[in-house]
Amino acid sequence: MQLSDFDFDLPERLIATRPARPRTAARLLLAEGDRIEDRHVRDLVGIFRPGDRLVLNNTRVIPARLTGTRTRGEAEARIEVTLMEPAAAGGWRAMAKPLRKLKPGETIRFSDALSAEVAEKGETDLRLVFDRAGAAFDAALADAGAMPLPPYIAARRAPDAQDDEDYQTVFARHAGAVAAPTASLHFDRPLLEALAARGVGFTEVTLHVGAGTFLPVKVEDVTTHRMHAEWGEVTEAAAAEIAATKAAGGRVIPVGTTALRLIESAAASGAIRPWRGETDIFIYPGYRFRVTDALMTNFHLPKSTLLMLVSALMGQERIRAIYDHAVRHDYRFFSYGDASLLIPGG
């Protein structure tokens, strides 16, 4: 299975840099079996069935993008930092630009209330130890940081105050992600309430999405690719809700690939169980899904592991047809783009 099997041409004009307003005005490509319909997210109330269960990732994106100053003697250098994940040795793993201007032991000052020491420096990233922890760190980061927009958006514009709302789900609870579970950005409170009134259930899980979600696949044989690890949790109550839905014949529908990867990790034994820890599950064609019946997700990058995941769910030829339709009909792609609802079979 070759990386080139997952390539496609995407016009740059289809890369969304702002979300639809309101959130539910985003377009929705409904693909059920061989059928494709052009709908909108607001139509989900008539698409989902009573007894369906949506699995939502309630992670909260932290303002992980920082700009600071490194002082060496009388020389100063402007440093841009993106936090990636908490480091096992303490502090945070981070990317920095320009990395070459930093040495272990040096301090980066981000604000009067927040500084960090370069504890370790690798070839592509570093480990930072901040001068604050706990609630004090969270408060200082909130003041000094900005939303860590994906590279394909950040290359086109800088983050602003509007992203603080746009790049956060309405049910975000547990801080720790440095990228949003973007399929969930399409939901607002009125839509959630309308779905609940229809008899659709909701289960919340937590997967702290890491910056590794944007890393390219660098091997031609995709089966040899190794995924980045991300921390997640499926509580006992969440596992019980999902199991009860399966037992009753309802559909389990993750909203986003992060929720899907987490519940499939928790069902590695064949049945969904409470689960907590790091997952590096890599889903590509040939994978046998254990609890997922359908998936709501945005449109993904060429040659990405997420495109491989949806190809595993729907089949490679079917995904090619779906993405060809999306491009021809001007669907907006990636994090702030439109959505798809992928239902195998039909």
From Swiss-Prot:
Pathway: tRNA modification; tRNA-queuosine biosynthesis
Reaction catalyzed: 7-aminomethyl-7-carbaguanosine(34) in tRNA + S-adenosyl-L-methionine = epoxyqueuosine(34) in tRNA + adenine + L-methionine + 2 H(+)
S-adenosyl-L-methionine as UniProt keyword: yes
EC class of the enzyme, as a word: transferase
Matching Gene3D superfamilies: QueA-like
Entry annotated with the keyword S-adenosyl-L-methionine: yes
One record GO biological process: tRNA wobble guanine modification
InterPro entries the record matches: QueA, QueA_dom1, QueA_dom2, QueA_sf
Compartments it resides in: Cytoplasm
GO molecular function: S-adenosylmethionine:tRNA ribosyltransferase-isomerase activity
Keywords carried by this UniProt record: Cytoplasm, Queuosine biosynthesis, S-adenosyl-L-methionine, Transferase
Gene Ontology CC: cytoplasm
Domain of life of the organism encoding this protein: Bacteria
EC nos: 2.4.99.17
Residues spanning the signal sequence: none
Its biological purpose: Transfers and isomerizes the ribose moiety from AdoMet to the 7-aminomethyl group of 7-deazaguanine (preQ1-tRNA) to give epoxyqueuosine (oQ-tRNA).
Subunit and partners: Monomer.
Family: Belongs to the QueA family.
Entry protein name: S-adenosylmethionine:tRNA ribosyltransferase-isomerase
Phylogenetic classification of the source organism: Bacteria, Pseudomonadati, Pseudomonadota, Alphaproteobacteria, Rhodobacterales
Gene name linked to the record: queA
